[in-house]
Amino acid sequence: MTYLTGIASAIGISHFSLCQSSDASTRSPRVVFSGIQPTGIPHLGNYLGALSNWVKLQKSSAPEDELLFSIVGWHALTLPQDPAALLAARRDMLAVILAIGIDPNRSIVFHQDHNPNHTELCWILNCITPMGKLRRMTTWKSRLAASRNAGSESEVDESLLNAGLFTYPVLQAADVLAYRATHVPVGEDQQQHLELTRDLADIFNRTFKAPSPMFPLPLYVSTKCAQAPSKRILSLKDPTSKMSKSSPDIQSRILLTDTAAHIKAKIRAAVTDSIQGITYDPVSRPGTSNLLTILAACSDSDVTEVARLYENKGHGHLKSDVADAVEELLKGPRAEFERIRHETQYLADVAARGAERARLRSEETLGEVRKRIGLA
């Protein structure tokens, strides 16, 4: 979970940019929540699309705004996990968050699974969530499609899929509503889940009215500032698909831990085309356009302006510059990550402090929820 303006509008989610200037004296403090799964070292797409935006939010937020960034271990369990690998991945993801610049003194940084209030609220929300809404969730439908493609039967066998995957969006809603978050940065694939979160907040508010609405309807966050907004980074080997940690081809993605030599080799082998000159055309030239997108994102530049600089150059020149730009972007966070990941006591202390702050914050919400539903 990494919690496009056009898409948000199309499905009815209000959006807001925390980078917009505003008079803090004329508005209420904002509560921003976002989470990321601890499944492997983040790749360039994660960094440019979600993690770097967390840093922008931290820098641009007002002093009275609350920021919560969570490693959502319970969500990872919807798919089979090796326990030892998951334990290491949780610790590494915390190190990554700190390495990129999230300050645990300014923001609440914590492991979701260290705060049982999430699962308690998830159960309560499950009891007011219509089955029909969950069946329309794209996560569930995509797993059904995968099941159908894997087997020879024409009918999908839902018994092969776990209930956690089916109710995953409700846990995501609980993650957000436990802190009465007002703003949620989400990725393109999670926008439908944010709409469900707003629906469940509204259902609870209407069902348990007194004395006033319990939950705000969280807004989709756009981090578009004066700089160019982050673009979706695609696979280096299949530029029709997004860069993904789950791809079996390690050459398809650039990891935060990749050395300069690894980065150069992966960019050099990236799929492009045989057309002379460089132009930005995502439909006809997805590979070339993906490299231009990466280069523009690394420098917070407009991709069409970047493309004009290369219109009379070749792919070799472009790939060399992209590799240099990516290395320049990642070398600082990479070095900091390698330093922090071995400081196990420091990481444990940060996690413990973050969990305590998160529990105190969410207990206020759960206490009121229990009272309203009759369980106080």
Regions found by a protein language model. Give the residues of each.
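Short amphipathic alpha-helical interaction patches enriched in hydrophobic/aromatic residues
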Residues: 40, 78-81, 181, 275, ...
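Short capping/connector residues at structural and topological boundaries
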Residues: 41, 49-52, 114, 130, ...
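N-terminal mitochondrial targeting presequence
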Residues: 1-29
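N-terminal Rossmann-like or analogous alpha/beta NTP/dinucleotide-binding catalytic cores
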Residues: 18-33, 38-174, 328, 338
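Structured ligand/cofactor/substrate-binding pocket environments in proteins
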Residues: 42-51, 68, 72-73, 83-89, ...
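Short helix-capping/linker segments at secondary-structure and domain boundaries
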Residues: 129-136, 178-185, 296-306, 334
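Conserved nucleotide- and phosphate/pyrophosphate-binding catalytic cores
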Residues: 44, 198-376
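Short, histidine-centered active-site or binding-site loop motifs used for metal coordination
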Residues: 36-38, 73-75, 183, 247, ...
